[in-house]
């Protein structure tokens, strides 16, 4: 009997300050990068999976605090995307942090090795696919874009 594949729900939180976006470098190791979509070594925005019984708000607050130490106070839903490859399939919600407090710190070094602010016009090429899609949604002002897999 084969295992039934399931679709997960994840989110990325776009934190912007003075025209720059916060991105973290995923660990190069597949064992520690914790990426079902296999984004080892790529740049990602703070992100995570929605846990059972959690609201979008509580999940976003939890993940941003766990990964960066930043307290999310207000956000809005920016976009929804369909992210899939041969390893996994997720519906990804993009959130835009509207109000937040604190400075980014490496809180989970086994997953994210550094946090860095990038100019929105000088984003690195090696982006985690869900992050690339959320940034493209933001730049184009679109809620959904098909075909960046």
Predicted regions and their residues:
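Short, well-ordered beta-strand micro-motif
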Residues: 15, 94-98, 116-119
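Acidic/histidine-enriched, glycine/proline-rich intrinsically disordered or flexible terminal extensions
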Residues: 140-149
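Conserved N-terminal beta-strand and adjoining loop/helix that marks the start
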Residues: 1-23, 29-30, 46-49, 80, ...
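Residue-level preference for beta-strand/loop junctions
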Residues: 5-7, 39-41, 89-91
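NUDIX/MutT-family hydrolases
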Residues: 43, 106-139
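Conserved Nudix-box catalytic region and its N-terminal flanking loop in Nudix hydrolases
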Residues: 20-66
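A short coil-to-beta-strand element that immediately follows conserved catalytic motifs
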Residues: 71-79
